Amino acid sequence: MPKKSDTTRKLEDVGIEIDGDVDSAEEDKKSKGKGGKKAAGGKRGKASEDGEDEDEDDKPPKGRRAANKKKPAPVDEEDSDDDIPQRRSAGNRRRGNVRERGDGDKKKSGKKGRRGGKKNEKGKGKDSDKDSDKDEKKKKNSSGDESDSDEEDESMSEGEMAKLMEEVEEKKKLIANIRNKPWRMRRRLKVLKEAQQFVDKFEGALGKGKGRKLYAYKVMMMKKWIKFKRDFENFRTACIPWERKIKEVESHFGSSVASYFIFLRWMYGMNLVLFSLTFGLVVIPEVLMGLPYGSIPRKTVPREDQDTAMDYSVLTDFNGYCKYSVLFYGYYNNQRTIGFLKFRLPLSYLMVGIGTFGYSLMVVIRTMAKNADVGGGDGEDNEFTFAWKMFTSWDYLIGNAETADNKYASITTSFKESIVDEQENQKDENIHLRRFLRVLANFLITCTLGGSGYLIYFVVKRSQEFQNMDNLSWYEKNELEIIMSLLGLVGPMLFETIAELEEYHPRIALKWQLGRIFALFLGNLYTFLLALFDEVNAKLEEEESIKNASIWFLKEYYANYTANNPNDTGTPPPINPADAIRGPCWETTVGVEFVKLTISDIQVTYLTILIGDFLRAFIVRFLNYCWCWDLEAGWPSYGEFDISGNVLGLVFNQGMIWMGAFYAPGLVGINVLRLLSSMYYQCWAVMACNVPHERVFKASKSNNFYMGLLLLILFLSLLPVVYTIMSLPPSFDCGPFSGKERMFDVVMETIDLDLPAFMGTLFGYVANPGLVISAVLLMVLAIYYLNSVSEAYKNSNNELKKKMQMARDEEKNRRNNKDSTNQVMKDLEDLLPNRPPTPPSPRENIAEKNQGQGGKSAKVKPGTAGGVHLQKDVSLASANPNARGPVTRAPGPRGPGPLPGQPGAGRGQGPPPRRQ
């Protein structure tokens, strides 16, 4: 065997085929004699001696490359050749078909120069000429590399294209769900970066030919659209008002306190829309296009009141200039159209009044429907509560220290809430004593409600007597507002004291407390309305006499003017608006009462927070060191946030706004300012002055209980306004409906004058009582049917939940009891005559083989009866005989022997099992 050179041996060891230029003449002849032994696999022709054949051999066949390729090359023509992945089969790699470019050629030429006596007959000059020819031909062929790569990409089969598409989709899913992976952050970032690089590199390769650029453009636009939606969602979340404040409160005081501020924010949004409707369609048109102040009597302060119209005491009572302003009903003119736009102000006033209730009703019902499904389908929350909170509560993407502190406080509070729920579920009680105490508590609360209603009715009657008296004190002027505010302040505290007898769960106790305070506020409000309507009826009687007197006064004025100026044939000058006789304008009187009630409620609420919370916390904080007892642990201690009182205060105040907005359009703006200031003021108070409740509890996942109270008071607030519109006659000298029999007549006037005749006929048919009653009955039947269907669906869902829970429990028991440790169950299993066979485990197979060879007896499992084979030993609790049994041994190092399921793979220090 001829001896090979060192260079040849090294090149063959690494799998590089030796070309004719490298070998010497003798080796070239010997290689020819061996019949092309160095040709890999015989599939490729012998390498030629010139550079052109060598370059062609460097490129693999296109067909084989397309068949063996798993990942396509980049599709862009601008990509370099280094980016094209080299795909070769395993057989070609074993045969040494991998060739080097560029640097390999330089190494070959360098090694040729160092060979000395084994040079070729052509010499150095010929070798250098050949190398230069190779470089020139490579440059000529470099222009065709890009077209060759494109042809190779286009030669991908449909299966490879589908496989690549699946891989790209999998990477996209991984990118979308990377947060849900239980990995460390370093691994998440690494996997995310790799997936993004893979998608960016191969997503454009899914197009073909001319459609590739269009596909790449679509992919780019899709990415930009997804990024835009994500940024817009972040922007919309950032635009939610007071989100950070509410989250901070929730983290320290629990979800129950945060639910109040969420409800307050929702109320602010709804009132902002009502404010836009009222000011945009009523107040601003009257200010811009209506008659100015002082032009007519309803817009002018009477002459006898002008001297005191700007006094502070008068303005705080909303008299003087406040009474004759756009804040109240009486300021608006009854002209059918105003301004150059011919704006129909009376119709707009009525439609806005009705639309306020319509929009509020729609928003409340929609919110309740949206929250109805919140909290459904969360069966896992009822099991392993503390395990879920322990292992899934923390957010590992938090990077802010303040956010981490809030999250820590929130998790701590949620654990306290769950502990309270667990304690309430396990509490034992004396049922008879509990029933007696609850009946007693309800009796005391009923007496309190009745007494507060009688007190308000008595005060309203007394205030009517004060109106005819002069030189009243401040208390006598504001007695009604003071009594109602004090009842709203003292009543909830009294109810909370009585509720201690009942010992309800905190969440249930909160609902009872809310219901009782709601009954107190609603009773007070309706008592106030009944007493107020008695005053309205008295003013209507007074208005008739004043109307007759004003007509007589006008006739007397014209007669006196004609008598005093007999030569004047012109029209007499109009009466000065300040000197005209005024009616009582009962709508403005009602509006003033509602505004005063709202302002007094705001004052009492803010003073209560300032004195009852801030001053109390100040005393406890700074006087505790020099006091006789511990002020923090004993009396007075820090205050707790009164959820029920504050929620019912909001609901009660909103009911007054709905009722009074028709008589005082400016009341909606006052309420918006109140809610805006309450958010900042109460957030500061609760964070600075209050402490969390001793019994922290979770709020309901939806605020539907609050919404239910709001819906009820909305309906009850609608009744007085509808009664006013349809039944009571408007004042004759103030307001947009003056001069009409009923306020609703403005709609009939618009239909008769502005719409075609058939519209009036159609509206008359629609307003027919028979049709209205039929429609109402149909709606009631539809509601009953839908409610029945909803109850049926709810029962079906509950049954399905029970079945799913039973199936989950059964599967859990079956999995846990596969290898029963109960001796009685084992004895019962041994006595069963017929059992389904199970395939033997690998250990049993090895034991049987050893028994067949060595003649040893088969091992008998402890506890099994005689004559029962080990293969037939099946647990009663196992439904699947092929299921793997649980691990019943203690964890520890595995001994010598094969792994389970791998008889030939030894593990440990012992030898592997003997092979047959």
From Swiss-Prot:
Residues 293-344, 460-478, 538-649, 726-762 are extracellular. It is a multi-pass membrane protein. Keywords: Cell membrane, Ion channel, Ion transport, Membrane, Transmembrane, Transmembrane helix, Transport. In adults, expression is restricted to the hair cells of inner ear and lateral line organ. Expressed at higher levels in the larval inner ear than in the lateral-line neuromasts. GO terms for biological process: cellular response to mechanical stimulus; detection of mechanical stimulus involved in sensory perception of sound; inner ear receptor cell development; lateral line development; vestibular reflex. Its main location: membrane. The chain crosses the membrane at residues 272-292, 345-365, 439-459, 479-499, 517-537, 650-670, 705-725, 763-783. One of its GO terms (molecular function) is calcium channel activity. Coiled coil: none annotated. Residues 31-45, 62-72, 108-117 have a biased composition (Basic residues). Residues 14-26, 145-157 have a biased composition (Acidic residues). One of its GO terms (cellular component) is plasma membrane. Signal peptide: none annotated. Residues 1-13, 97-107, 118-138, 804-818 have a biased composition (Basic and acidic residues). Residues 1-159, 804-916 are annotated as: Disordered. InterPro entries: TMC, TMC_dom. Belongs to the TMC family. Pore-forming subunit of the mechanotransducer (MET) non-selective cation channel complex located at tips of hair-cell stereocilia. Highly permeable to calcium and likely transports monovalent cations. Interacts (via N-terminus) with both isoforms CD1 and CD3 of PCDH15A (via cytoplasmic domain); this interaction is required for mechanotransduction of the hair cells and correct localization of PCDH15A in hair bundles of the hair cells. This is Transmembrane channel-like protein 2-A.
